[in-house]
UniProtKB/Swiss-Prot annotation:
PANTHER family: AROM/DEHYDROQUINATE SYNTHASE, PENTAFUNCTIONAL AROM POLYPEPTIDE. In the N-terminal section; belongs to the sugar phosphate cyclases superfamily. Dehydroquinate synthase family. ATP binds at residues 864-871. GO terms for biological process: amino acid biosynthetic process; aromatic amino acid family biosynthetic process; chorismate biosynthetic process. Keywords: Amino-acid biosynthesis, Aromatic amino acid biosynthesis, ATP-binding, Cytoplasm, Kinase, Lyase, Metal-binding, Multifunctional enzyme, NADP, Nucleotide-binding, Oxidoreductase, Transferase, Zinc. Binds 2 Zn(2+) ions per subunit. Homodimer. This is Pentafunctional AROM polypeptide. The keyword Transcription does not apply. Its EC number is 4.2.3.4, 2.5.1.19, 2.7.1.71, 4.2.1.10.
């Protein structure tokens, strides 16, 4: 900085008006008073600056100066709220109105004391007040000092973007007092560094280099706060740095502004990073600061320069590394950005729209500052860039078009440095002593993680040279110390393995241990064998989460003993390389023995040994023992220079491009002398497939051929290249067999499975082998075009499929395109810029469901205790889904030709478990789709079986835990003597297995005890509904806010006490909320999972409504303990496992729980909730904004925000909030009596209560009836809506009493009437007239108009079209009429209610062939009847209907008897009055009743009288008669729902029609 009182002056626009100094408040005041005279000075600042005492200090100094010189001026002060939201029209207007009220005139001088927001806005006030008054900039933040205060650009923000309304208005002076920085918060300091880095990046390469090396001391200084006053910091260690960057940036900006004040071209350069950065800021403000958005914008604009072929990949990597070094974000995926913005999305279309109103643009052409090198721009102005190129850089996915066809060309491509060699070089130089210049390093995410970790461990210092092409590493000879923070390695598998061993050499430092961790996928990847080897040699390592994977806790100061170390090398050669490189630093020489068979990827082991020799340590191979190495003690000596080969794995992509397109491609720096096994790819794979290959010691050239041929190849020396080989094999003649690649199952993903699944999308058939894959090549013309290719966040998957997609005639979308940055950040630039393959950025619609698996019909593996019902329910499940059922125990007995008891008696339990595991794995592999497989109860006792089931679950398979009351299971098992006896006590077995079932299962189905056929049928119905939810066949649809939906909040401690009341309690509700936290099981604070499952089952048994599953914590007004996160997670996940329709997720749940629920929701919809019980928030507070954004970030399907009203006006504030937040469905209400109006005006899933509940779930809750009556009173319902029935005769129709009773029950102000007519045109005329007035509610259609009305309708549902009849008319959008048919549902529900699902469904009989009979056929088919018979007096009519369907047959009495049919259901579609006159029908029904021992007879005619058919059935034992009135009410309930959007109150409706 500067000595106190020392002032540096910088000229701008011909005047030395920029004054820079330290503690210069006296200078500021004296300069203003002496040289900028005025009657009124106005000091405008924000509350943060005011709270720090600066305003009072300046005020005192001004008043002293006025008094001293006898000046009769006044100083007024005005304070605004801090933050970007204050930079608005409203704030500007408020300041101007206040100034006018204070009598300010043209001579007023405004002093802007604050950051960029204050400077920009107050400058604009000065520019417009009285047509312009003088103002002075006094910046207090680093960002304002180096950027926004200089140049006279003033502005405010608008909803469409930042700084769009403003003026050029130069300040009289800019006083930069760096002492203000001593109270600058850490985040604001870092925020300001973005502008410093920006200036250096486009203008000053030397300063950029200085910034690269200064981050560590800069950050450590600004973070070291004064213990007595944490707001203050001692900046003395970086005095010179701050002085230099402030003065340097001010000079650069002043020079540019002086040359181009009005932004004609040159001044645009100051906007590097801002074109895209401002677009991000417009969306992310106020969560993400200006500098943070500019940091992301700089990286994106640099990537754009690279994509256009102007900027080198090294320069982009340097810029990103420098930005990250100052803890600024480089992408939206930055964890801090996600956390602060609550994961708010920045849609590319929105970003481009915002960029479209940038001031630099030339009409519709966007202009962006393009770098050509660090410190240089492509042009001396912003350059014109096409939208498609910007879109590509901003997009997360890419559409790959067809490569140019025609003349064959030659290309030369140099891939980035080898990741394998780069990472080894980092470890060796860090463990080595002295300086070493590393050239051609890979700049990637992986190597960046390695570099950052080595720096944190103190292993080496790094300095970039030659524009970032060379890295000077100065190693510390293996002296590593434990850092304060954990080492985060992302998904960098190589870094994790190499650093695991290196971390054992660490001495105690800031901590006495080292934590190695990574992202979610990294925490699934194996590292167990390496840890086992290190532990056996004395290292103290603990798994922090899952056994065998990161995160690891490694104790410091322990080291390695040396001597013999054994490691399994059949999974990863990196375990071996890790041990080899660190072995010289063990306490004694090391003998490394590789056990378990032939090592995988021997080439990489040889590479490590060769590189160790280059650094002075020679490894010798044992001459007698296979796979054994001797490593001496020592310290590596760093060579002066080490050149990293290009990555041979990456080189396979351009070479394969040549093979597939017929072009010629040369990779100039990889040849036969390469250290890397993948260098053999061209010879061993492409040449064998028919390509022309020329390979020298240092280069490789491939020319493709029209007809590639399949090969068999062992790719063990080059396993990473197998993915490239697969896509070439896909268009080769014959079947390619690739082996030796078992390790590829445990890379970034299971790559063998990934290639099989994704190639299938192209129509290419693959088969997985134990250590490889078979690929059936097909003709290019037979390739199918996938909707999209899933990359699994795996760089090699993405790059491989980009090649296959480039030879497709139709474009292909590839997801997660950025994953290539792991090894080749510029791959897409090569594909587009070198090979001219058309690329287009795209944002694909994301559906949150099961993990990408390629399993269209995932099999269901059932686990659970013996006696839980696995076989019985499994067979039912298979029947319901149309899958094949297998009992694993029975299959095993058949396979081994023995019984399980005999097998155990002969060979013991261990042998049985081994055979069971073998068969399980076989089924998981061969029967992964279309099966329901019941496993033995003890399968989970075998760890490998659990692993296999969990793996299957992880790729989208279903592992279903079937359970029933434990007491019933134990009771059954104690009686069962047919199976092997348990070794342990049954209760102990259950307690042991309970957790194991939970760990492997994706879902759980609880079957309650059944004591009747009806109860058994209900459980079967529950199972079918459950399976439909799990498989996505039935998915809850979030209602539209215009539908007036609600849910009943159940508050019973045990819902069984209200089981029979549930239908009446829930009348008019769209869902039931089970408050799990309110359940009381034996006065325990937390109910058991079995108790919760039993409660859910009671709800499912008694009400067919969706369930909202809620575990409300005490902090959010519930009863669940806040200090039980594990138990909370278990209960929340139980809701997901039962596939509830809706799950409440408190937005204040632990972040990892919210994240896991969001990722594993299946088809469950999420309701993200926050409740302000204390009433601390008002609806204009930022906290509600944050909660809304946090909910969208999960993302949830419904946002639920609940405030506490303190006055009636809080309801209007809530409605303003609702109106402003429409991007996600919003349930927003106020609690308390003052807030009851909000429950009326909220129309989406309003929580309601009922008079018969023990208590209301929240203060102020109302019933459905109360809410609807109020809505009616205040005009939310249209009282003039008309509902009626049409047809003739309708005088005795029960529909009016049905609907009017239901309207009244729910407090709806409607009337249902009759319109007698047989003229469809008259119905249409009346309906259209009512539609025009907005007064049509709905119409029931009966005979004779069900067919006649169809031509008059605008739309007819598919079901009604199939039947050819409409019984319901619904008003549609834009004055349309839609026809539907609810008769089918009426018929199905009536039969189901009386137990149709428990009957034998071989045959059903329909009597009559009129319009209703078509509905009957559809209904019976949907119930699962295998054969349907139809009889009619006129046989041809029955035959006409039968001909429309499979398995429907027209019968006569004679054919019925002759075929000995045994129907279990009879449906009469003959009018009740004519049935007795039909002698044939009478006889046929009599024959059917006699043919079966039991069944149901449904009379489809709506008659309340005792009909002839009823009398006929009453005399037959085992048969039950169902009145047509049940069908009437059931179809009417569906009509009611279609018209109102509200479920019908069935109990009162039915009672009105049927009586008691």
């Amino acid at each position: 900085m500067f000595a106190e009182g020392q002032i540096q002056k910088v000229p701008i626009l011909g005047k030395e008006s920029i004054h820079i100094g330290y503690k210069m408040q006296d200078h500021i005041v004296s300069e203003i008073v002496a040289n900028i005279k005025s009657s009124t000075y106005i000091l405008v600042t924000d509350t943060n600056i005011e709270d720090l005492g600066y305003v009072e200090s300046l005020k005192t100094k001004f008043e002293a100066a006025f008094a001293k010189d006898g000046i009769k001026s006044r100083l007024l002060t005005y304070t605004v709220a801090p933050g970007e939201t204050s930079k608005s029209r409203a704030t500007k207007a408020a300041i101007e109105d206040w100034m006018l009220s204070k009598g300010c005139t043209r001579d007023t001088v405004i002093l802007a004391v604050g950051g960029g927001v204050i400077g920009d806005m107050i400058g604009y006030v000065a520019a417009t007040f009285m047509r312009g008054v003088r103002f002075v900039q006094i910046p207090t933040t680093l960002l304002a000092m180096v950027d926004s205060s200089i140049g006279g650009k003033t502005a405010i923000d608008t909803p469409l973007g930042k700084n769009l309304v403003g003026a050029f208005w130069q300040p009289v002076n800019i006083f930069i007092d760096t002492s203000f920085l001593e109270t600058l918060p850490v985040r604001e300091f870092i925020n300001g560094m973005a502008e410093v880095i920006k200036t250096a990046a486009f203008y000053d390469a030397e300063e950029f280099t200085r910034l690269e090396s200064a981050s560590e001391i800069f950050l450590s200084t600004i973070k070291k706060r004064d213990a007595k006053d944490p707001r203050r910091v001692d900046l003395s260690p970086i005095t010179d740095t701050i002085g230099r960057i402030v003065l340097g940036s001010a000079r650069i900006k002043a020079a540019v502004v002086s040359a181009d004040e009005r932004e004609g071209g040159l001044r645009n350069l100051l906007n590097f990073g801002h074109s895209i950065g401002h677009a991000y800021e417009a969306i992310l403000t106020p969560y993400i600061l200006h500098g943070e958005c500019v940091a992301i914008g700089m990286v994106k604009e640099a990537e754009l320069s690279r994509y256009l072929g102007i900027l080198s990949p090294v320069a982009v990597a340097r810029l990103a590394k420098c930005i990250k070094a100052y803890e600024l974000p480089v992408s939206l995926d930055d964890a801090t950005v996600k956390a602060r913005s609550h994961g708010k999305k920045c849609p590319v279309d929105d970003l481009l729209r915002i960029m479209g109103v940038d001031k630099k643009n030339d009409g519709s052409t966007k202009k962006i500052v393009i770098l050509s090198a660090i410190g240089k721009t492509h042009e001396q102005k912003a350059s014109s860039v096409a939208d498609k190129d910007i879109r590509f850089v901003l997009s997360e996915e890419v559409i790959v078009g067809e490569a140019p066809v025609g003349d064959k060309k030659s290309y030369t491509v140099t891939p980035p440095g080898s990741k394998s060699i780069s990472n080894r070089a980092f470890v060796l130089t860090a463990l080595g002593k002295g300086p070493c210049k590393l050239r051609n390093l890979l700049h990637s995410d992986d190597t960046q993680h390695m570099l950052e970790a080595i720096e944190l461990l103190g292993g080496a210092s790094f300095e970039w040279e030659a524009d970032g092409e060379t890295l000077l590493v100065t190693g510390n000879g293996g002296k590593l110390t434990a850092p304060a923070q954990e080492l985060y390695l992302g998904n960098a598998g190589t870094a994790s393995r190499f650093l695991t061993t290196a971390a054992t050499l660490v001495q105690k430092g800031d901590k006495d241990h080292v934590i190695l961790t990574g992202n979610k996928r990294m925490q699934e990847r194996p590292i167990g064998p390496l840890v086992d080897a290190l532990r056996s040699n004395g290292a103290d390592i603990a798994f922090q989460n899952a056994e065998g994977s990161l995160p690891l806790k490694i104790e410091a100061g322990v080291g390695l003993k040396g001597g013999l170390i054994e490691v399994a090398a059949t999974v990863s050669s990196q375990y071996v390389s890790s041990l080899l490189m660190c072995a010289p630093y063990a306490q004694t020489p090391v003998t490394l023995s590789l056990v378990g068979g032939k090592p995988i990827s021997q080439f990489y082991i040889d590479m490590t040994i060769a590189m160790m020799a280059d650094f002075g340590v020679v490894v010798t191979k044992d001459e007698t023992k296979e796979h054994t190495y001797h490593i001496p003690q020592g310290v590596y000596t760093n060579p002066e220079e080490y050149v990293v080969e290009s990555d041979a794995s990456s080189a396979t992509y351009p070479l394969a491009y040549a093979a597939m397109t017929g072009h010629t491609v040369t990779v100039p720096n990889i040849g036969s002398k390469s250290l890397q096994g993948d260098a053999r790819f061209a010879i061993d794979v492409l040449k064998a497939m028919g390509c022309t290959v020329e390979q020298t010691a240092t280069s490789t050239t491939v020319t493709g051929v029209p007809n590639l041929k399949a090969i068999a190849v062992d790719m063990e020396p080059m396993t990473d290249a197998f993915l490239t080989a697969c896509v070439v094999a896909a268009v080769s003649e014959g079947t390619t067999v690739i082996t030796g690649i078992a390790n590829q199952r445990v890379k970034e993903c299971n790559r063998i499975e990934a290639m099989r699944v994704q190639l299938a999308k192209y129509g290419v058939v693959c088969r997985e082998l134990e250590d490889g894959i078979e690929v059936d090549g097909i003709s290019r013309s037979d390739l199918k075009t996938p909707v999209s290719v899933h990359s699994y966040d795996d760089h090699r998957v993405a790059m491989s499929f980009s090649l296959l997609s480039s030879i497709m005639a139709a474009p292909v979308a590839i997801e997660e395109r950025r994953c290539v940055e792991k090894t080749w950040p510029g791959w897409w630039d090569v594909l587009s810029g070198v090979f001219n393959v058309p690329l287009e950025g795209v944002t694909l619609a994301k559906t949150v469901s099961k993990a990408e698996s390629g399993l269209s019909k995932p099999s269901i593996f059932i686990v659970g205790m013996r006696g839980a019902g696995k076989t019985h329910l499994g067979a039912q499940a298979a029947n319901h889904l149309g899958y094949e059922f297998i009992d694993l125990d029975q299959l095993l007995e058949k396979d081994l030709d023995t019984t399980i008891p005999q097998l155990i008696a002969d060979k013991g339990w261990d042998h049985f478990r081994a055979e069971e595991l073998r068969l399980l794995k076989q089924c998981l592999n061969d029967k992964s789709e279309g099966y329901v497989i019941s496993c033995g109860g003890g399968v989970v006792e075998t760890p490998a079986a659990r692993d296999a089931l969990q793996t299957f679950k992880g790729v989208g398979g279903i592992v279903l835990h079937v359970h029933r009351p434990v007491s019933r299971i134990l009771e059954y098992l104690n009686k069962d003597q047919s199976r092997p006896a348990f070794v342990d006590d049954l209760e102990a077995v259950w307690q042991r297995r309970k957790e194991l079932y939970r760990s492997v299962s994706s879902n759980v189905f609880f079957a309650p005890h059944c004591d009747s056929a009806e109860a058994t049928a209900k459980v079967q119905q529950m199972l079918g509904a459950f399976l439909d939810r799990v498989t996505g066949k039935s998915e809850f649809v979030i209602p539209h806010k215009d539908q007036f939906t609600s849910f009943l909040s159940l508050t019973f401690p045990d819902v069984s006490i209200a089981a029979t009341m549930l239908p009446s309690l829930s009348e008019g509700c769209s869902a039931l909320e089970l408050r799990v936290d309110l359940l009381n099981e034996n006065d325990e604070a937390i109910p058991s999972e079995e108790y919760v499952l039993s409660q859910l089952a009671i709800l499912r048994q008694n009400v067919d409504l969706p369930i909202l599953y809620t575990v409300r914590t005490k902090a959010q007004g519930g009863r669940f303990p806040d200090d039980k996160p594990v138990e909370l997670a278990n209960l929340v996940n139980l809701g997901l496992k039962t596939a509830v329709e809706l799950l409440d997720v408190e937005l204040t749940y632990p972040a990892e729980l919210v994240s896991s629920v969001g990722a594993s929701r299946g088809y469950t919809k999420l309701l993200g909730s926050h409740h302000d019980f204390p009433g601390a928030l008002n609806w204009s507070s930022l906290e509600w904004e944050n909660m809304y954004a946090r909910a969208e970030a999960v993302p949830v399907d419904v946002v639920k925000l609940v405030g506490m009203a303190k006055s009636f006006s809080d309801n209007f504030a809530l409605e303003n909030f609702r109106e402003a937040h429409t991007s996600s469905p919003l349930l927003a209400i106020n609690m308390g009596s003052h807030g009851q109006l909000s429950r009326v005006t909220n129309t989406l899933l309003t929580p309601v209560t009922h008079a018969d509940l023990p208590v209301a779930a929240a203060p102020g809750q109302l019933s459905v009836e109360e809410i609807n009556q109020t809505r009616s009173t205040i005009g939310m319902f249209n009282k003039n809506l008309s509902f009626f029935i049409v047809g003739t005769p309708i005088g005795h129709s029960k529909s009016p009493i049905l609907h009017n009773t239901m309207f009244k029950k729910l407090g709806l102000p409607y009337e249902y009437s009759r319109f007698k007519t047989d003229d469809a045109a008259a119905v249409n005329a009346k309906a259209r007239a009512l539609l025009a007035q907005g007064n049509l509610g709905g119409i029931s259609v009966t005979i004779p108009l069900k067919q006649d009305i169809i031509p008059f309708l605008d739309e007819v549902s598919p079901l009604a079209q199939q039947i050819g009849a409409v019984n319901t008319i619904i008003p549609g959008p834009n004055g349309t009429l839609k026809g539907d048919n609810t008769d089918i549902l009426g018929l199905v529900n009536a039969l189901t209610r009386f137990g149709a699902n428990s009957l034998d469904k071989k045959t059903a009989l329909i009597v009559g062939a009129g319009g209703t009979s078509l509905a009957a056929v559809h209904g019976l088919r949907s119930l699962g009847f295998a054969k349907i018979l139809i009889a009619n007096r006129t046989l041809s009519k029955a035959e006409a209907i039968a001909d429309k369907f499979d398995n429907v047959e027209a019968v006569t009495l004679d054919s019925f008897v002759a075929n000995k049919y045994t129907p279990s259901v009879i449906v009469s579609c003959v009018p009740a009055t004519t049935f007795s006159m039909l002698d044939e029908s009478n006889k046929l029904v009599s024959a059917a009743l006699a043919a079966s021992p039991k069944g149901l007879v449904l009379e489809a005619a709506y008659s309340a009288e005792a009909t002839p058919l009823l009398k006929q059935v009453m005399d037959v034992e085992g048969w039950e008669f169902i009145s047509g009135l049940y069908m009437l009410t059931e179809q009417g309930f569906e009509q009611f729902r279609l018209w109102t959007g509200i479920p019908a109150p069935k109990e009162v409706g039915e009672k009105a029609v049927l009586g008691n």
